[in-house]
Amino acid sequence: MKEHKARKRFGQNFLQDTRIISDIVNAVRPQADDVVIEIGPGLAAITEPLAKKLNRLHVVEIDRDIVCRLKTLPFADKLVIHEGDVLQFDFNGIAGKKKIVGNLPYNISTPLLFKLAEVADDVVDMHFMLQKEVVDRMVAAPKSNDYGRLGVMLQYFFDMEMLIDVPPESFDPAPKVDSAVVRMIPVKHRIGKADDFEHFAKLVKLAFHQRRKTIRNNLKELAGDDDLQAVGINPQDRAEHIAPEKYVALSNYLAGKAV
């Protein structure tokens, strides 16, 4: 079979470390009847061991050459191939509670994670290879340098745990950054339920818009000092000092005042 060269425009770095591959599959714990979706199967490093354990495996792939390769594999009859951009993919179009796994293209990881949060109610768990810097931000606690909008928003939907550190030499071609595997398990209302999710999302985005400024300055168009203090937020604190549940509480307090 003709060798496939990684394409930079698709953010392709192909995992080749057999130990890491085995660790990922063991973390996913696929059972024969599970509904599993793999994002970016690439050269099938994870696809093959998953397919061996599953009756059916959905894969989402944008690269036409890779799609053609997938169709020639010995286990191709187990694959349901969805060709196209994963950012446009309808995850709800696949019935059942889903496990989602993938070596995500680093150039679209943040918008893809926000998209996946929208389907959290129909997900059992997710396991992703990502740039380690992104995983650090996802799991970060308040008062840490990595804590920000991404962490707050994803922690609203998921319990998350970094599972595996992955060095650059585990890939071909080797990326210029370290990678990590993260497990994401949907947890409803772990930090409280936002009465108006769009308001909550807007508030969090504004809060972290200028990290060096106080929460009073960043949220001045939405909240005054009295509003902040009503839910236990010090107006002089910066956004990274405020726990996710405080953002939910503030959003609900402001939404309640507007009624």
Curated annotation (Swiss-Prot):
EC number: 2.1.1.182
Gene3D superfamilies membership: Ribosomal RNA adenine dimethylase-like, domain 2 (1.10.8.100), Vaccinia Virus protein VP39 (3.40.50.150)
Pfam short name (any one): RrnaAD
GO molecular function: 16S rRNA (adenine(1518)-N(6)/adenine(1519)-N(6))-dimethyltransferase activity; RNA binding
Annotated localization: Cytoplasm
Keywords: Cytoplasm, Methyltransferase, RNA-binding, rRNA processing, S-adenosyl-L-methionine, Transferase
Role played: Specifically dimethylates two adjacent adenosines (A1518 and A1519) in the loop of a conserved hairpin near the 3'-end of 16S rRNA in the 30S particle. May play a critical role in biogenesis of 30S subunits.
HAMAP family associated with the record: 16SrRNA_methyltr_A
Protein name in the entry: Ribosomal RNA small subunit methyltransferase A
